Amino acid sequence: MAGPQGTELSYIGKGSFSIRVKGASAGLVPIGNVSAANVRVTEDKKELLDYQSAGGGQANALRRIQTVELGMTLRDFTADNIARALFGSASVVAAATGVTESVTGYHDALTPLGKAGVTNLVVKDVTDTTTYVAGTDYDLLRSGLWVYSSGSIGDGDTLHLTYDHPAQNVVEALVNAGLEYEVFLDGLNEAQSGKAVAIRFHRLRFGPVQDWGLIADDYGEIALTGDLLKDTTITTAGLSQYMKVTYV
């Protein structure tokens, strides 16, 4: 029961976000660790000044919501999160053994390989008759081949490779237009003994990531901002076409 000073209902939010493409026949999948999430509202304000008195002031004012945005700071670099940030597509390549690949090797330079995390690499010439020696003719880097000018491989030679590779995620960037999503927060209020908070964003369209640090000294983040749009599939009177907040 509220006292003379009102009810104490402070808020410190925590929780897990889930997402799915708007209209998809699929469940909402976890986004992962989100270190910050903020709803930002901008307004269009019309002011009518009082021109009838010397003291000034306002005769009337009109405030209309102009835009609503959801800003999120993602900390899990899943392939799906990266794809959303770069308007891309995500896929998984299964682990494989005995994979073959043909590349051109250049002296004292890096040749990228088609897969990452390669092991059990065998490098041969274009006729498959000469097997080159690791550490003398070439070195295997994390995702590429380094050819030594002091070795037996000629500059610009075609090389036949055989190797194994682990399962890996692949993101092809900038191949999709920005998709629309439904986002749900399964949250809690830490300031109120962890009581449940549920927020549903019915229709969001995210923009691309503005700044993605590829090399840094601290944990990385993906900062996304989405526009909250009107969901015309919700037609029941009294129900929001934008978002719904439920809390205990």
Predicted stretch roles:
Residues 126, 142, 148-153, 197-248:
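Mixed-charge, glycine-accented linear interaction segment located at domain edges/termini
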Residues 69-73, 160, 182-184, 223-227:
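Beta-strand secondary-structure signal
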Residues 149-168:
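Small/polar beta-strand repeat architecture
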Residues 78-142, 164-199:
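Extended beta-strand solenoid/passenger and fiber regions
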Residues 30, 131-134, 148:
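A sequence-level detector of short linear motifs
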Residues 67, 154-158, 178-180:
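Extracellular Ig-like/FN3 beta-sandwich strand-entry sites
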Residues 2-84, 137-138, 195-197, 201-222:
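Solvent-exposed edge beta-strands and adjacent loop segments
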